[in-house]
């Protein structure tokens, strides 16, 4: 059978494109080299807990179109991301808010906190040249040293003075007692896990797992008129211009015979000495209960370690510095010449996407491609 579209990858980008193409009457084949669907949003049920197998995924967006779209495929709970920072046994609120400033300096009013931050920000004059200067210009030296520096250096594997300033803009700062990390209108976790949501997207669509597209490219290409490729763009071209760099993450999962390990879904370890960046306790994404509302007797934690990516590792975060940006630009020129192939998603576009921006991107592409 000849398909209209071959979709490479069953993560959010691939699954949504496949769903939309099928809805427009197109025939679609989805292939994925993993033994499971859903890409990095894959969740697996263990001991009644939906475990986020490729790291914590908390859906949040201000885009009503995206929210209305994705909630067709899952009911979302009211989970709100309120991580805790652990610095050598001292616990702080994340995002940086009045609880954080009170613990750090003993200040009680927003006015006092603002004055303290302003006083410490003066250390940096002019445009921040790197992440360290940017962080100090946002929250001052004390919070930078205890809550930003060690965590960020573990996450990126390099000194904060060598990292670009824009990375730290992802850390909200507020002079209120609001513990909600994301300033988003819509937020939550799909009840029953992300895998179930992706299953709903792929309902009625042929999916072949354990199928490496690049190993069987010629025979798979022959099956379809057009390809939607969501894998790494440099791998598609055999790395012939060089390898794009990523940060990778590895997880050490542990099942514990206790009901509660840390009392929160995410605890960041912000000192340099603790080897992991954070511990995720998955059951709290769904309030410690199963789908029938029963308390879960056991808990599952994941210690998360950042690492330099090497061939064979899972690529997570593109290293969007100048060198990699230029190399991606050259691959993009090659990609633009590939008639009949659409490159999309985090790996296909070498771009940091949150889930909502991935969805917005693929919906825009569907409008262009499918009408």
What is each residue range found by the language model?
Residues 43-69:
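N-terminal glycine-rich dinucleotide-binding loop that anchors FAD/FMN and/or NAD(P) in oxidoreductases
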Residues 12-13, 35-37, 99, 153, ...:
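Short, solvent-exposed loop/turn segments at secondary-structure junctions
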Residues 85-92, 99-226, 230, 235-237:
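Active-site/ligand-binding neighborhood in enzyme catalytic cores
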Residues 66-88, 143-146:
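A short alpha-helix-loop-beta-strand transition element characteristic
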Residues 3-30, 366:
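N-terminal Rossmann-like FAD-binding beta1-loop-alpha1 element of flavoenzymes
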Residues 24, 214-334:
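Mid-domain catalytic core of redox enzymes
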Residues 19-47:
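Glycine-rich FAD pyrophosphate-binding loop
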Residues 314-371:
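C-terminal catalytic lobe of FAD-dependent flavoproteins
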